[in-house]
A protein has these predicted regions:
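Short acidic active-site motifs
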Residues: 66-68, 126
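Conserved catalytic-core segment of nucleotide-activated headgroup transferases in glycan assembly
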Residues: 2-65
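Conserved acidic donor-binding segment of nucleotide-sugar-dependent glycosyltransferases
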Residues: 115-124, 133-138
Length: 167
């Protein structure tokens, strides 16, 4: 695989997905992240709002996909509370790297790849409890790192893709 040489040692902080436009859920993701750390990162996105960088997070510059994966790999945890279930690449990218991601059940990649970390839409209290457990319980954290990597291989690896689409 493409990024096998990336190390999962020395990960720190939280990467949140989405910006502060309501349907991206960035504010909800930020509040959850701030409940455990002030080391919070966010990729710049097309619907970015002026002043987002003043909310106590590090906003990353636009980057290509390789740069994004390398930057995401530096983080301990992903949070993406996006209520519009249109994409799913954030949960998928986290899983590929073995990074636990908290998000909503209705997004298929979230539910399939991070089953212990998925909550019903709008259930931020349950999400907060999961974030705290991941941050403070090393066994739970490691269990979910291992599980998501395993599920990625079973559900979304190149081999599975080729078999599914008969390539």
């Amino acid at each position: 695989p493409l990024f096998d040489s990336l190390s999962d040692e020395n990960r720190s902080g939280i990467m949140i997905g989405g910006n502060m436009v309501s349907w991206y859920g960035g504010f909800d993701s930020l509040m959850l992240a701030q409940s455990v750390t002030d080391e919070i990162y966010q990729p710049k996105m097309g619907r970015r709002q002026e002043g987002e960088e003043q909310l106590g997070l590090t906003q990353l510059p636009y980057m290509d996909w390789d740069g994004w994966i390398k930057e995401l790999n530096k983080r301990k945890l992903g949070i993406h509370m996006m209520r519009t279930h249109a994409a799913g690449t954030f949960a998928l990218n986290c899983s590929y790297l073995g990074i636990p991601c908290v998000g909503y059940n209705d997004l298929d990649t979230q539910r399939i790849l991070h089953p212990n970390l998925s909550v019903d839409d709008g259930d931020l209290e349950s999400a907060r409890k999961i974030v705290h457990k991941l941050w403070n319980d090393l066994d739970f954290y490691k269990e979910n790192c291992i599980l998501t990597k395993k599920l990625y291989q079973e559900e979304y690896s190149e081999k599975v893709f080729r078999e599914r689409f008969k390539i």
